[in-house]
Structures are given as structure tokens and as C-alpha cells.
């Protein structure tokens, strides 16, 4: 099994994570697909890729919880003996006015989008550091760079991911472990389902390519960084 590299992707049953899983599997990686609530989507993806003869596993874990994040990493090691690439993709978005953000929503956003990156990365490094090898790719957002009205909590978590990535890259570089972040613009995922057509048209006009990004665009970037 060590002849293939192994990638663990959090939140990979839908959207960007799904596209990443497909591309890596088709490029000869062992792929561990993580999901929390979207079991049907995860199984559908698993069935599709295994029917192609590809090396894929699925594992349910809420990575905002330390014990489940640890279990996910341990499962990956148990299946494939190593983690060559970790992609922290799991995240949620709940647009609303800042004054309408509840304390519970704030805590959920921080734990799901930011703390999960810490939990999974910390556990994965138990295996990467002894090998003096590895790639960590964190999925952030352009809102982590410029901020978004009605998504203050989301923007804060994505900015936190960028800060964590910069610091960790400096710390782990001497150990031959690369750490990068991808900060996508507007990508066509379920997070856009509630937007009106007028809003979508406006977003297209503000994008240099004059189109909404596709999950596959981000997957190609992740594969390049791996």
C-alpha cells in the first residue's frame, strides 16, 4: 500500500471536497473521504470511485470534536499506514447580520471551520513529523483576506486559517512538511443555493474570468500543491 500516496480530505462528500477527492483518486492516491451529515452523498461518491477500481475509504467524523478528529486520523493510518497529504476542507457558512449572530452560532463556526483544522492537523503531525515528510493544504476563502458583510463569523474563521497556515509553514518547513492555504473566490457549491440570480450575475461581473468558479478549479490547485 505504501507505493501509493495517501490523502485525507475533511468534509469531502460534497462541493470542493468532493471534487478534490475525485481528482486525487484518479491520480493514483489512496483517498479517505470524511463526512459528518451527508452520508448518502459520501456513499454515492465512494460507490462511483470504487466502481472505477480506485482506492477509496469513507469515514464519518465530526472534526469539530477532538475525539472524532483523532479517530479519523487513526482510521486513515489503520487503512493506509501513512498520511502524505492532509486537506482541511470541512466548513460551514450561515450568512446573517453581525447583530443576529448568536453565541451558539459563533462557537459552532469557530469549532467547525477553525478548531477542526487544529485538531486534525495536530493528530496528523504525530505521523508526518517522524517521517519528515508531508503536505498540509487548508481551504480558506477570499473572505479571510478581505472580509464579507453578513459573514463576519465565517470571515473570521477563514482569516484564522490563513494566519495559522503562515505560522505553521514556518514551523514545519525545517521538517520538510509543506503547509499552504487556498483562498477561493466565489465557487459554485451548495453554499450559493440561496443567492438570487441577480446576485449571481453581479458576482460574475466582479470576477475577472466573468464566471463563477467550479469546485474542479480548486481541486486542480490542491493537486498542484500536493
Q: Which residues make up each language-model segment?
A:
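Conserved glycine-rich Rossmann-like NAD(P)H-binding loop of the short-chain dehydrogenase/reductase
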Residues: 29-44
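Conserved glycine-rich cofactor-binding loop
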Residues: 13-15
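Residue(s) in the substrate-gating loop at a strand-loop-helix junction
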Residues: 141
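Substrate-binding pocket helix/loop in short-chain dehydrogenase/reductase
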Residues: 97-98, 105-110, 192, 203
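Active-site helix of classical SDR
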Residues: 121, 157, 165
Amino acid at each position: 500500500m505504501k507505493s501509493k500516496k495517501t490523502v485525507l480530505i475533511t468534509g469531502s462528500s460534497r462541493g470542493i471536497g468532493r471534487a478534490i477527492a475525485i481528482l486525487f483518486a484518479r491520480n493514483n492516491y489512496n483517498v479517505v473521504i470524511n463526512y459528518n451529515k451527508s452520508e448518502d452523498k459520501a456513499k454515492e461518491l465512494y460507490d462511483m470511485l470504487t466502481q472505477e477500481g480506485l482506492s477509496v475509504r469513507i469515514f464519518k467524523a465530526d472534526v469539530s470534536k477532538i475525539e472524532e478528529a483523532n479517530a479519523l486520523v487513526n482510521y486513515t493510518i489503520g487503512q493506509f499506514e501513512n498520511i502524505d497529504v492532509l486537506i482541511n476542507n470541512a466548513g460551514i457558512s450561515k450568512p446573517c447580520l453581525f447583530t443576529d449572530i448568536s453565541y451558539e452560532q459563533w462557537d459552532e463556526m469557530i469549532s467547525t471551520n477553525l478548531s477542526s483544522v487544529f485538531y486534525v492537523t495536530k493528530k496528523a503531525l504525530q505521523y508526518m513529523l517522524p517521517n519528515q515528510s508531508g503536505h498540509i493544504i487548508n481551504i480558506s476563502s477570499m473572505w479571510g483576506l478581505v472580509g464579507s458583510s453578513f459573514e463576519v463569523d465565517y470571515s473570521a474563521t477563514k482569516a484564522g486559517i490563513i494566519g495559522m497556515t503562515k505560522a505553521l509553514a514556518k514551523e514545519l518547513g525545517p521538517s520538510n512538511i509543506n503547509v499552504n492555504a487556498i483562498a477561493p473566490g466565489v465557487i459554485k457549491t451548495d453554499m450559493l443555493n440561496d443567492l438570487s440570480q441577480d446576485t449571481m450575475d453581479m458576482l460574475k461581473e466582479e470576477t475577472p474570468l466573468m464566471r463563477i468558479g467550479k469546485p474542479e478549479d480548486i481541486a486542480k490547485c490542491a493537486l498542484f500543491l500536493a
